[in-house]
Amino acid sequence: MPRLGPGGQPEWRIALVPASQAEVHDTWHTTGLCGTGSNDYSIDGVLVQPGHTFALDELQREGTLYRWPGFFITNSLGIPLGVAADALDTAMGILDRKILMPERTPARDEARVRAAIARAHAMVGSARSYAYDTLGGFWSVLESGDQPSFAARAALAGCYVHTMTTCRDAVQLLVETVGTAAIQRGSSLERNLRDLITMGQHLVAQVKMREWAGGLWFGQPAPLPVI
């Protein structure tokens, strides 16, 4: 029988066991992020000692970094921003050398190309600024010794989705602007887009996260303690 928490729901805990006690299933055959190896696994008949389990809302250490259980998710903000920044550099390099056909004019002189590059830079730059602003404010709250308010948690939850989706859309725009050079296998732009499409399937990039963020803005707790 599962142990029930204060709200009457089964308690959810994370268990740490040696890899040799788990069976890893070769299931990670995906559009992008192929190198992460995020395979499924199963564990059967393994006794886990209580000291090798923990719940995310059990704070184990002192200090700002450990004051709120969901802070570990914030590292996900840097991944789409880094991929999008790489895509911008790559696209700029290609378009600076590309000659458009049949016009035989440099791509960098084309109004459509210039507008797309300006828009992509603004999209990635604004997402980065919003992430830094939101996360910086959140950190200041924790640094002061306080727990984050519903409003602070709402802003951070919404920031996850905004950063992921904005970076993905910016790279999609770059791929469309660069053209066939961006869809060749081995092109870093092609890989950038596939990786961001795959990242977009993570919980922090889903509409559900936006719904939880909206609930937090109205003072309603999210179903996960890390949101």
Regions found by a protein language model. Give the residues of each.
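A short core secondary-structure module
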Residues: M1-V24
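Short beta-alpha junctions and helix-cap segments that line functional grooves
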Residues: D26-H29
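Glycine-rich beta->alpha junctions and the first turn(s) of the following alpha-helix
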Residues: T31-G125
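Generic structural signal for well-ordered, non-transmembrane alpha-helical segments
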Residues: G82-A85, A118-G125, A157, V161-R168, ...
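Charged/polar positions within long, soluble alpha-helices
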Residues: D89, G93-D96, S129-Y132, G136, ...
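An alpha-helix initiation/capping motif
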Residues: A107-R114, A118-H121, F150-A157, V161, ...
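C-terminal helix-coil-helix/basic helical segment that borders enzyme active sites and/or dimer interfaces
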Residues: S126-H162, Q172-I183
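Glycine-rich phosphate/cofactor-binding loops in nucleotide/flavin-utilizing enzymes
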Residues: V178-I227
